[in-house]
Amino acid sequence: MTKSTDILISTHILSGKNKTYDTFTKYISSDFRTIKASNPHEYIEFCWNSYETKCPKAAKTQSLNGKVFEAVVATCLYREGILPMFLQAQVTFVPNVDFDIVLFKEERRSPIGISIKTSLRERYKQADLEAVALKYVHRNAENYLISLQSSEVDTVKKKLKDGSLLGLNRIIAADTPEFDDLISE
């Protein structure tokens, strides 16, 4: 059995032994496959709570928070067998956009873009612009914004519902059962 840390690198969930790698393996788990969680959103909750409570406040930065959250979501997708998965991916003919995660379903040839944000504030606008760019090239592309802040997610969902956002299909809080629904689709 391959060590989880080897899987983190070999699947490109993490690009190597760096600060994110060290943080994930030290404060969350050295083997993410052994974490007991009955569904994806509980896995996200467990991992994020471990990071929040165990990692010293002085070590946390907004950048590290974002990278750790991306790693948590990516390891969750891996655990659920959602592959292939491309991290920090560029899509042909979609210039100047690095998608947090790009997926492809077997039955579809269109990409699924996933934008991952620890908090939304104004960041949902960037995610929507990236989604519009992807849909401009790949008409049937799907785009999802995943965040941790349920209250912010509810606010931005209203903008999606009233038509203020054009590219995003859904906005989901990763620590809710709605995330489980997305994973099962």
Give the positions of each predicted feature:
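Short His-Asn-centered micro-motif
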Residues: 90, 114-118, 146-149
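Conserved catalytic cores of phosphodiester-cleaving nucleases, focusing on short active-site segments
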Residues: 101-103, 107-118, 127
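Active-site-adjacent loop/helix micro-motif of nuclease/hydrolase catalytic cores
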Residues: 117-130, 154-156
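Interdomain/boundary linker segments immediately adjacent to catalytic/signaling cores
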Residues: 1-72
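Domain-level recognition of nuclease-like catalytic cores that cleave nucleotide substrates
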Residues: 150-185
